[in-house]
């Protein structure tokens, strides 16, 4: 008898089905439509992701979305926490990706606590660049409070990565992305992070963020159990090609990629989680249940999240 088919879980969702979660005063109907669309793609649990912005704006967004979450049982069930990606990222071009340089700053525990309070204590994942001063202390404090710390949008040295791991960092966000188009041949951030078996790598299986052969190489290089899959989806996911927003950024979804017009860097993805499972199974040579585990139980276990069984119908 086959194992029960569980919901997928995505730890990095910036928007979906034409809805941009970065929008201030996001309408309740839009958020409900987005989570309904996610569930149609077999994804009943997500970490809703907010990206870099001014601290006051992030606090307002968290407080507003948390009010919507509390007021709607379907939203509350689907949005089981938040992922904060910025403003504690690298300000260097290339490493910051589409995140604005002007708002990046050293990790600040009091600022994080303000955002955590606004989010009702549900920020469960924070992505940061550990080269900022005070990063190790910050990681130690937030991980002791139950928040998972992930390294991303970073050009940290080996010693800075080592300090972050010893402080409690356990993930790396969209490994192979959030980096410049050109890197040194050997000593680069992808290799530095990949070399650390303590870190679980989050990978985006859309064929754009990582070509299939790169996805295979990264998957093979990590120890068993040290890879998770995510979409980094934004509002263009489960929506037609065209113009969309990612917060204050205007982007274009075309040919399976989302970019700022005139820029080479990616700005999230238009991948849906169920398509990500199909891609992973095909490109990594996995059985369906093995690919689903990377997008469900294995990821959810990092956050103590129990996934529901999908209705066979």
Predicted regions and their residues:
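Divalent metal-dependent hydrolysis catalytic cores, especially in the metallo-beta-lactamase
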Residues: 13-20, 32-61, 77-90, 119-131, ...
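Residue-level marker for buried hydrophobic side chains located in beta-strands
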Residues: 7-9, 82, 150, 227-230
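Di-metal (Zn2+ and/or Mg2+/Mn2+) metal-binding site signature of metallo-dependent hydrolases
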Residues: 3-24
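Short helix-capping segments at alpha-helix termini
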Residues: 70-77, 119-121, 144-146, 222-223, ...
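Active-site-adjacent C-terminal substructures of enzyme catalytic domains
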Residues: 138, 160-292, 302-306
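Divalent metal-binding pocket/active-site signature
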Residues: 84, 91-188
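Catalytic metal-binding/acid-base residues of hydrolase active sites
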Residues: 14, 89, 154-155, 207, ...
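Metal-dependent catalytic neighborhoods of phosphoester/phosphodiester hydrolases
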Residues: 56-67, 95
